[in-house]
Design a protein with these regions (language model features):
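RNase H-like (RuvC/DEDD) metal-dependent nuclease/polynucleotide-processing core
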Residues: 2-7, 13-71, 76-298
């Protein structure tokens, strides 16, 4: 049975400020075949997002030279809730592309891990609603008129959704509008999306971002003809067992996801995770703006 991928790279991400390793930092797991075609695994724990970006570029280039088609699983959102691009009055490309370009242009992340995500969140609030909403969460020193320390109010009728459709399906991840505190998905998205844009550009046109450029549907090997790397959003906690005493949770999770996807691919079952076989009323929102978390059942 033909596999979809020859190698798996899984990233558990962090929006931490300052150099950080260990718990709640960036972990990158890599599963590939060695020269004797035996399965091998390695883990990396770069101290900054800049180091992670450089490492990912190197890893993808090396795997590409080997002739492996690469699955790159990223532990942060690649899209925003439906309607976000329109609320920002962006136009031209597809909404997901508009948002990727907007965030990549606005967010500045220094080699020291210092970044301007709170300023960007405040700017987006001003452009979308003119109030400290929907983005929320910041240290007191970074709070401002358009970004509050705590959530300003609940989402109501007429507001942008608090959660994307895939998040509603599992009710696990925090909202992308949360920029600070534990599980700050918004901080991870704002600092992670520019890296996705740069890595994709470095890897060339033979890279694709799922489901925006592949469709939200089951994938077969023929669907990936001409594709060297597929980028997708993953939620490492979805598959991973609890860490034992002395283990780093994030490290355990990236390995578990690598092993899970490899096992499914070996059985010819991984392709079914990439979307529903039948038509779905959510398809347009998923494919055009929100994306989907791989492994979450439609």
């Amino acid at each position: 049975m033909t596999r979809l991928f020859g190698a798996y790279v899984i990233v558990d991400y962090s929006a931490a400020e300052g150099k950080k390793t260990g718990e709640s930092s960036v972990w990158i797991g890599v599963m590939k075949r060695d020269v004797r075609f035996r399965l091998s695994y390695e883990a990396h724990n770069p101290a900054t997002r800049a180091e992670a970006q450089a490492l990912l570029k190197t890893l993808l280039a090396d795997l590409h030279k080997r002739g492996d088609r690469i699955f790159l699983g990223l532990g942060f959102p690649l899209g925003f809730p439906r309607g976000t691009a329109a609320a920002l009055k962006l136009s031209g490309a597809a909404p997901w592309r508009q948002m990727l370009d907007f965030v990549s242009k606005e967010v500045k992340d220094k080699p020291t891990n210092e970044n301007n995500r709170f300023q960007v969140g405040a700017k987006m609030n001003r452009l979308m609603t003119g109030e400290a909403f929907p983005f929320w969460g910041a240290p007191a020193r970074d709070a401002q008129t358009m970004l509050s320390v705590k959530r300003a109010r609940e989402h109501g009728p007429g507001d942008l959704p608090e959660f994307r459709l895939s998040e509603e399906a599992i009710k696990g991840p925090s909202s992308i509008w949360k920029l600070y505190y534990q599980g700050s998905v918004g901080g991870q998205a704002l600092t992670g999306m520019p890296i996705v844009s740069r890595i994709r550009t470095a890897h060339g046109e033979r890279a694709r971002i799922w489901p925006f450029e592949t469709g939200w549907k089951p994938l077969a090997p023929a669907d990936l003809d001409g594709v060297d790397a597929l980028f997708a959003e993953v939620y490492p906690s979805l598959f991973a067992p609890k860490a034992s005493a002395g283990q780093v949770k994030d490290e355990v999770q990236v390995r578990a996801v690598c092993e899970r996807f490899n096992a499914l691919d070996e059985k010819g079952q991984l392709g079914a995770l990439f979307g529903p076989a039948k038509d779905d009323p959510r398809r347009d929102a998923v494919e055009s703006e929100e994306g989907w978390i791989l492994g979450v059942s439609p």
